[in-house]
């Protein structure tokens, strides 16, 4: 078993923990309505791995899910989203012979579209593949366009700017 891949991949807790409690909740990378730029964006963090029950040969550990990737699509004219663009975090593994002992899933990644016109009715998704206790945090989606004609869906809600920032690394 191992921690999930991506920046901030979690560690390997032991089982059983000293006490059982509620679920941990992943944090959010900023607030969609307050994003002013997404220049230095990264993929999502990996989920925490889970060790098996010490001394048991029937309960092995499981690995955390990988974090979602970072996708940048830029055009000097137009981007049309007709299908699905996804940067989802992977689901954490489940310990053998158990259904309740699950490693953490990776958080969603980042999607950034930059063009004078963004259109289409497709979907943009940057979320964790899991729900409930083992879910990772949502990712981020940013649309930078002077003419937004995109009528599709985003999960999580995208931040939108009419100012197109530089797309070159380090700029």
Description of each model-found segment:
Residues 1-112, 116-121, 126-139:
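Glycine-centric low-complexity/flexibility signal
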Residues 137-171:
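Extracellular/surface-exposed low-complexity segments
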């Amino acid at each position: 078993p191992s921690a999930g891949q991506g920046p901030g991949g979690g560690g390997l807790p032991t089982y059983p923990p000293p006490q059982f409690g509620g679920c941990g909740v992943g944090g959010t990378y900023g607030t969609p309505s307050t994003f002013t730029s997404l220049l230095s964006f990264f993929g999502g963090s990996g989920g925490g791995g889970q060790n098996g029950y010490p001394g048991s040969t029937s309960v092995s550990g499981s690995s955390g899910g990988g974090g979602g990737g970072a996708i940048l699509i830029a055009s000097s004219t137009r981007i049309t989203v007709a299908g699905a663009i996804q940067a989802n975090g992977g689901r954490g593994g489940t310990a053998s012979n158990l259904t309740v002992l699950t490693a953490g899933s990776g958080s969603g990644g980042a999607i950034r579209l930059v063009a004078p016109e963004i259109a289409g009715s497709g979907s943009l998704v940057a979320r964790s593949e899991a729900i409930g206790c083992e879910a990772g945090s949502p990712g981020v989606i940013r649309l930078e366009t002077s003419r937004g004609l995109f009528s599709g869906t985003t999960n999580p809600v995208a931040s939108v700017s009419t100012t197109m920032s530089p797309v070159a690394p380090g700029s």
